[in-house]
Amino acid sequence: MALFPAFAGLSEAPDGGSSRKELDWLSNPSFCVGSITSLSQQTEAAPAHVSEGLPLTRSHLKSESSDESDTNKKLKQTSRKKKKEKKKKRKHQHHKKTKRKHGPSSSSRSETDTDSEKDKPSRGVGGSKKESEEPNQGNNAAADTGHRFVWLEDIQAVTGETFRTDKKPDPANWEYKSLYRGDIARYKRKGDSCLGINPKKQCISWEGTSTEKKHSRKQVERYFTKKSVGLMNIDGVAISSKTEPPSSEPISFIPVKDLEDAAPVTTWLNPLGIYDQSTTHWLQGQGPPEQESKQPDAQPDSESAALKAKVEEFNRRVRENPRDTQLWMAFVAFQDEVMKSPGLYAIEEGEQEKRKRSLKLILEKKLAILERAIESNQSSVDLKLAKLKLCTEFWEPSTLVKEWQKLIFLHPNNTALWQKYLLFCQSQFSTFSISKIHSLYGKCLSTLSAVKDGSILSHPALPGTEEAMFALFLQQCHFLRQAGHSEKAISLFQAMVDFTFFKPDSVKDLPTKGQVEFFEPFWDSGEPRAGEKGARGWKAWMHQQERGGWVVINPDEDDDEPEEDDQEIKDKTLPRWQIWLAAERSRDQRHWRPWRPDKTKKQTEEDCEDPERQVLFDDIGQSLIRLSSHDLQFQLVEAFLQFLGVPSGFTPPASCLYLAMDENSIFDNGLYDEKPLTFFNPLFSGASCVGRMDRLGYPRWTRGQNREGEEFIRNVFHLVMPLFSGKEKSQLCFSWLQYEIAKVIWCLHTKNKKRLKSQGKNCKKLAKNLLKEPENCNNFCLWKQYAHLEWLLGNTEDARKVFDTALGMAGSRELKDSDLCELSLLYAELEVELSPEVRRAATARAVHILTKLTESSPYGPYTGQVLAVHILKARKAYEHALQDCLGDSCVSNPAPTDSCSRLISLAKCFMLFQYLTIGIDAAVQIYEQVFAKLNSSVFPEGSGEGDSASSQSWTSVLEAITLMHTSLLRFHMKVSVYPLAPLREALSQALKLYPGNQVLWRSYVQIQNKSHSASKTRRFFDTITRSAKPLEPWLFAIEAEKLRKRLVETVQRLDGREIHATIPETGLMHRIQALFENAMRSDSGSQCPLLWRMYLNFLVSLGNKERSKGVFYKALQNCPWAKVLYLDAVEYFPDEMQEILDLMTEKELRVRLPLEELELLLED
């Protein structure tokens, strides 16, 4: 039979020998044509064999022949043996490749794989020994059909539908919709070529894996892999050069010797002299001597020896001086350095690496040292605090609280310990609640008051107790404000004002506890309190009670109903979370004052819709403290005004400074770029005023309160201004007028002309009323503010008249009055900052003002150009006055306030005078002269800081003059061409001395943002953050990177199109995240709500929602009291609004609009 049916005719043609030989390959002589009939018969008999129990997959056709040859039997037996051996090998050797030796019947891998599978359905009909009709062909046929499958398609005689019934089907065929890969015939492709195609124009892509052998290329491991980290932990080999006699001549080239000078030693075992000692021993069959093998371990390197020497030195010193707590603390800090070295404490081999990387080992070692230190110093609070801080890694929060309570019980007079204890309890999310922390503040202040009064005889009051108590009181007020309980915070301030300034004489000699008991009836009497209309104070109420009689209450007919929004929800189509946020913030803004029943309207306590707005005496009684210092009493008023949003110039104490920061106004330059010389820029910002919980990034200007809030502030001013006199009263008037001017600036910024007109009118009315008072007639601070107001309103000529009038009233004070110098300075600065069209004439006016300041004659208005002789005389007068002030500063200790303020104003005026008459370099020389004099005389070490009161006062002088210096440089760069380097250098030097100055940081970040090279900025920030304790460097470093990221994105998205980056900057996102994480490692950073708000806002802006949620919950672990964090989370994750509000309710934060009430409002 022909292999190819198409050539069947050619192969069977009776041709000659040559043609027959050519087509001989088309025929298969070993195939018997007569076997087709027997194959078809055996195929039909297959079901019968299946029913008899034969396997389905390999049901070989049985042969009926009795004359089977011995050769066929042997072939069959060997094939079966091979199959069994293969099965055993597959069972016991799954991962080894074995050679498969096949006989003549198994020539391809596909046939072997198919035969080796059992119990699988097969497409072919199994063949067995075939009965042959011809004896000479029987052996070959039997051998061929006994070991090969025969496919149904190959059997040409079978007609019709041929199939087999599988009694044991494979369910995998139905599940996977295809045959098992072992049942599919496979073959090996020899090359990827294909015959018949043009390789230049055509190609075939074969499916499956490529036949080319893949060469696995070993990649170089990075430094952070596990293996490389292990290599980094291996001890380094100490390398030391050979000692050579020093040469007197300088060596320009140091040669490296490749070989030793001496000839190698040769032996019979080492004929070339190239083997080392270890190789020689190995060739002899010997090992190294035991002592020699242990020698490297016995001799440590120089680094380990130095560390061991330090450890021994510490141990010796603490044995000799066990009372030295600082030495113990240094020993604890030294453990970090010891653990970085290769395990000095390793006991067994292999233990070194584990101990080196074990944080727990370091903590245990530190804890053991601290316990030894506490045994020798039972009264040391610092050691016990260090132990508690260390044990936060080991102990549960409840255990830590108990240990803190024990420590507080032992040291109830330690204010620093109370401060840390309150912060610890305030930042423990698991045990935190507003009521618990509020009562804890009350317990703290009442205990310290008892210590200060002497009621606790066992513990005397420590120095600075009163100042620390005042700082804790302010910290409690900001805590309540940030938690949303504004009513309680305002009530605390109201009570403290009455308790401090209006105390009856009959109770002044009593201890604080007794005074508080007498104060309770006044609080519950319904008498108007500080800030409320008709408030007279505690003392007047006591006199009225002692005298008896009735107090007639006259209702105010002009008093309208308080302004309330008739429609609290203005747009019901907005999403639910937006409606809630708007309504919640609106209620926070309107309802920050405590609710009290109005007797004129016959109201009772039951008329209050929200009981949380009422403040009981139990909420504030324990927190009342007695302030005997006059400075602290004035600071109390300033803090109250700052709390209400009035720029009083008060900066919170360092202990609660960053706790109070919760909004990003510290980055707002405002109008500073337009008016660098005259724009009011407060030294401190970042803390929201009461009632404000705006979203992050909302422009924060002094917009003022609503009508009731403005009336409340006016009442506070009217109540407290008669309590002070002199400079303090002048400062209060200045703050009030500055608050009104700030609202005018807000109207100018928003271009609200209607409100600007009314606000300007009210502000001028207030200024005139204040100047009409007899004690304020010669108050140059108020005259200065009034003239500045007229200038801001655009009334330049009226403002000049006010300035001229005030300067004419001064007479011939020359340069001795600091307020007069400040008035002249502002007048000159306003003239200088006029538009470029009139700047030449304005400069002449400014020179006239500063020149007249030095003359003994009365001031006269500007008439024309100042003569050169008068300018020279004025310069000499400034020089002599400055020398006199600097000479006094070196002698006087402590520095008087008047002397400091006079030096500041005089230096400013002289710098501006030199700038206008000579140039910017002359002004810079004045600054350098003052700085060098003060820095060398007051701070001999050149650090610019000191611990004494005198050093702090002179530091403030340098800081103010530095601000003038930088402002002058900025103005000069604005009006003329000037390099940026001097301003950058001046700011860099100033920030190293004053790292907490927000004004300097704002200027530095702004000018550095214009530079396309961020490397210097980053190095500078890195230097400052490593050494400075304040948090401002971290905040402004983050802001600088965010501004740079915004600039890069703006360039990349020019005109709404994606373009290539012209500023190649990568890694900004990760750099900013790293800055956030590093800033939060300190205690001040981890408990600063502003830092967490910025971090959360940044991650949300990147679109990383899951990471943002993680940061939000991490923020709650550190600042669970900050309501603004929860409001931000509602804005960023509106789907989880219900969960966030439930969390606020659980922690007792103030929720003014519950969701149930919101649903009712939406239905209405």
Swiss-Prot record:
Residues covered by region (MID/MTR4-interacting domain): 163-266
Basic residues: compositionally biased ranges: 74-103
GO biological process, one term: mRNA stabilization
Consequence the record notes for mutating D166R: Loss of interaction with MTREX associated with decreased RNAs stability
Any Pfam family: NRDE-2
Disulphide bond pairs: none
HAT repeat residue intervals: 305-337, 395-427, 758-792, 978-1010, 1067-1101
GO cellular component: nuclear speck; nucleolus; nucleoplasm; nucleus
This protein's UniProt keywords: Acetylation, Cell cycle, Cell division, Coiled coil, DNA damage, Mitosis, mRNA processing, mRNA splicing, Nucleus, Repeat
Annotated stretches, region: Disordered: 1-25, 39-149, 279-305
Recorded coiled-coil stretches: 61-383
Record Gene3D superfamilies: Tetratricopeptide repeat domain (1.25.40.10)
Positions carrying N-acetylalanine: A2
Locations listed in the record: Nucleus speckle; Nucleus, Nucleolus; Nucleus, Nucleoplasm; Nucleus
Principal location class: nucleus
Residue ranges with Basic and acidic residues bias: 61-73, 110-133
Protein family (similarity comment): Belongs to the NRDE2 family.
Assembly behavior: Interacts with MTREX; the interaction is direct and stabilizes NRDE2. Interacts with EXOSC10, EFTUD2 and EIF4A3.
Chain's role: Protein of the nuclear speckles that regulates RNA degradation and export from the nucleus through its interaction with MTREX an essential factor directing various RNAs to exosomal degradation. Changes the conformation of MTREX, precluding its association with the nuclear exosome and interaction with proteins required for its function in RNA exosomal degradation. Negatively regulates, for instance, the degradation of mRNAs and lncRNAs by inhibiting their MTREX-mediated recruitment to nuclear exosome.
Domain commentary: The MID/MTR4-interacting domain is necessary and sufficient to mediate interaction with MTREX.
Protein's UniProt name: Nuclear exosome regulator NRDE2
Organism listed in the record: Homo sapiens (Human)
